[in-house]
Amino acid sequence: MTFYLNCPYLCCVNDKQTKEDSVMLDTKIQKELTNDEYRAIQGWSSTQIKSVVKHSVRKALIPIADSDALRMGRAFHTVMESVEAFDRDYAVFDDTEIVFSIQRERPNISVPSMTKEYKQARKQFEQENQGKEIVSLDDFNTLLMMRENAFSNPQVEAIMQSADKTYVEQSYRKSVHIDSHQASVLVKARPDLIVHMGNSSYKMIDWKSCRDASPKGFRSDFFKYRYDVQAVVYCDVVGIDPRDFLFVALEKEAPYLCAVYGMTDEVIEVASRDYENALVSIARYENEMDEGGLTKDIVWI
């Protein structure tokens, strides 16, 4: 069973619907891109488009500052790609021995990581692993638990067993024509996973780390962060039916539970309308018809 997100309630339906089997992947960028290379290429990302939906074009143009949460998010998506990819890009700092040594010699130390010895050990480890991101052993164990629970979920397991080909972290780009303004907006997408099923249909899977993967908890995140808009952007750029887009919600805290969610037609319709309106705003901004800010009119709340 797969949960389908609706407003204002959740329904649970059998995942055996008649859907379009044909799909075009003509927008795929053939060159393999790293995350940094993808961010550098031209095109409006789903993150920026969501920002336009929630606020304005000018808000979407402000670069997002890096943070611990974003770094952990990148590590999460890398380990979901593959353990080999994680080993390539990350090094795990196991501080068990240095912490034990510090506490044995100075039992009154409450925060060993603030000591000179700890910082020296950390610095040496970073020097030995230049070019890699560093994650703690605790974070690494959490990531492995999340990955294990994702791929042992019966829905995910069934999809992967039916797959005859997978596209992992591939980059796509599409020029979307805006009829009302005789203009085009370049949009890009980098889905976590696209699975080609044996029956010639596709599933697009998006890994979502969260604190609460229950229907009530995930629904809150879903609409707060406009995951629906992200989904329709990805599906439009790649050429996949949004009903074949699945969110795999993974708790990043114990008990690390996992649930799979899809979107109802009503949710897709609202998200598609918001996406189209955002593209119009972007087109107006790019053609200097609008400064990309908030409305100058009075808005009655």
Question: What kind of feature is each model-predicted range?
Answer:
Residues 168-273:
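Mg2+/Mn2+-dependent nuclease catalytic core
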Residues 82-88, 239-243, 285-287:
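Short helix-capping/linker segments at secondary-structure and domain boundaries
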Residues 270-301:
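Polybasic (Lys/Arg-rich)
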Residues 5-8, 12-189, 296-299:
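Metal-dependent nuclease catalytic cores that hydrolyze phosphodiester bonds in DNA/RNA
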Residues 78, 235-236, 277:
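Generic detector of well-ordered secondary structure
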Residues 108-115, 264-277:
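Charged/polar, low-hydrophobicity segments characteristic of intrinsically disordered regions
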